[in-house]
Regions:
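Charge-rich, low-complexity intrinsically disordered segments
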Residues: 116-156
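Short, Lys/Arg-enriched charge-dense amphipathic segments
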Residues: 1-3, 70-90, 134-149
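Active-site beta-strand-loop-beta-strand hairpin of nuclease catalytic cores
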Residues: 3-13
Length: 156
């Protein structure tokens, strides 16, 4: 994780998470709950003035997922009591991370999110793929840069 503080004010915070197989199911649920809970805690602290009248900080979330057969395979769904939303039917954990990250931004819990995937070999070489255009690293860091630029412009 990374926190950016400028002149004693919280400017930005980023969470970096990773997941590799084999137990994608449990870990996906844990990562989802953690992302939502962390953001909620930060925004509650911000609302309550814990950051000493800091302008609204920028919050980002980056996920590095192992690109393997298990992360790309459709997940089985049981519906004993209620129907699952259609967008989750027949999806892989990789696709579910896309849906999660988009919703984290849509719900304004995070300002931006990025999904990076890599095989074990790619990861060791520092290489990765970006399966979703709207969740790429470049717009993620451009969003952060824009926020920092706004903070700096307000200092002059």
């Amino acid at each position: 994780d990374l926190v950016v503080v400028y002149k004693g004010k919280l400017v930005a915070a980023m969470e970096f998470k990773s997941q590799r197989g084999p137990s994608f199911g449990n870990n996906f649920n844990n990562r989802s709950e953690e992302a939502i809970g962390t953001a909620h805690d930060l925004w509650t602290a911000f609302r309550e003035g814990a950051f000493q009248n800091t302008p609204r900080p920028w919050l980002g979330w980056v996920m590095l997922l192992e690109d393997c057969e298990a992360s790309r395979a459709p997940v089985s769904i049981e519906e004993p009591h209620f129907k699952v939303f259609p967008e989750f039917k027949g999806t892989s954990y990789m696709k579910r991370y896309e849906l999660l990250l988009r919703r984290l931004v849509l719900e304004r819990l995070y300002d931006s999110a990025a999904l990076l995937v890599a095989t074990e070999k790619q990861g060791k070489a520092g290489q990765y793929l970006e399966p979703a255009k709207d969740l790429q690293a470049k717009p993620f860091f451009a969003s952060l840069g824009g926020h920092i630029g706004t903070i700096l412009a307000g200092q002059s």
